[in-house]
UniProtKB/Swiss-Prot annotation:
Taxonomic placement: Bacteria, Pseudomonadati, Campylobacterota, Epsilonproteobacteria, Campylobacterales
Entry remark concerning the domains of this protein: Has 3 domains, the large (RuvB-L) and small ATPase (RuvB-S) domains and the C-terminal head (RuvB-H) domain. The head domain binds DNA, while the ATPase domains jointly bind ATP, ADP or are empty depending on the state of the subunit in the translocation cycle. During a single DNA translocation step the structure of each domain remains the same, but their relative positions change.
Subunit structure and binding partners: Homohexamer. Forms an RuvA(8)-RuvB(12)-Holliday junction (HJ) complex. HJ DNA is sandwiched between 2 RuvA tetramers; dsDNA enters through RuvA and exits via RuvB. An RuvB hexamer assembles on each DNA strand where it exits the tetramer. Each RuvB hexamer is contacted by two RuvA subunits (via domain III) on 2 adjacent RuvB subunits; this complex drives branch migration. In the full resolvosome a probable DNA-RuvA(4)-RuvB(12)-RuvC(2) complex forms which resolves the HJ.
Name of this chain's protein: Holliday junction branch migration complex subunit RuvB
Protein localization: Cytoplasm
Region (Large ATPase domain (RuvB-L)): 1-182
Known catalytic reactions: ATP + H2O = ADP + phosphate + H(+)
Ranges where the record places region Small ATPAse domain (RuvB-S): 183-253
Amino acid sequence: MQRLVEVESVSFEEDNNEISLRPSNWDDYIGQEKIKKNLRVFIDASKKRKEALDHILFYGPPGLGKTTLSYLISNEMNTNIKVTAGPMIEKSGDLAAILTNLEEGDILFIDEIHRLSPAVEEILYPAMEDYRLDIIIGSGPAAQTVKIDLPRFTLIGATTRAGMLSNPLRERFGMHFRMQFYTEIELAKIIQKASLKLGKNCEDDASLEISKRSRGTPRVALRLLRRVRDFSEVENEKSIHLQRCKYALDELGVNESGFDEMDINLLELLISNRGKPMGLSTIAAALSEDEGTIEDAIEPYLLANGYIERTARGRVASVKTYEMFRLSYPTSLKLEDDLTQGKLF
């Protein structure tokens, strides 16, 4: 069963809903202010020169608006955007077919770009750098390289694992942007705008309540909004109010910190280890969960908000987590922290 606070997997129906709620201009796009400010400068400069925008890499946890920003860039540049994903490009021929169908100034958006195979990456290098496609025809001594000129295009890559990108690929992006978690105020504004598009007003305090439980992630906020709206409509309420909102979210198993059962299980597991670090593989086995899911979908929010810490030996629960569970922080850990920070000498 899909987690309500899951940020990686998106159903077809939900993806269509997200598209309908997607902002169409910079003023409608809330959050990521520094990125927006820089992008507007680069886009304006590119339009004045009548050149294709330089290649862009967006990285950071899932659900923070990488795809939405790419569509916005397409709108601002008044160009077409073609969307694909790393796992869908299995062979170099697949990428060659996509590239040769691009037109001057088009944007190619590749999600999960870190999952491209090395063979596909090799095709991408000259395409990004020289707008040229090198295709090998035949094999052995009779093999020939055919060079095909490509229109000047912009590649936008998105990844949740920037560290898995090869250096040659990473270096070919002219702009690198790290997506940040959203503040509660930013999410509340997103929720209010989205609720009106859904035909259901969400009151200010209810919007803030949803934002508090959305893990700093718009995708989660919009998903929770739709579910809270369901509860409200069943009761024939004209708007979403705070009491209904709290009731719905509690029923859905999302607590005031935005944690669900999976988060609680992870934190309880770390606490049960009596302060000793746990490796990722051990955690995954204990929770019967995939390592990638833990690393990409569960950990980022817990790390960013100080609930868990990564050490050279593994993951440990932080003081904040012990306080949340109303437990005493292990003395051995406190002593180790003091030694590390030089507080005892």
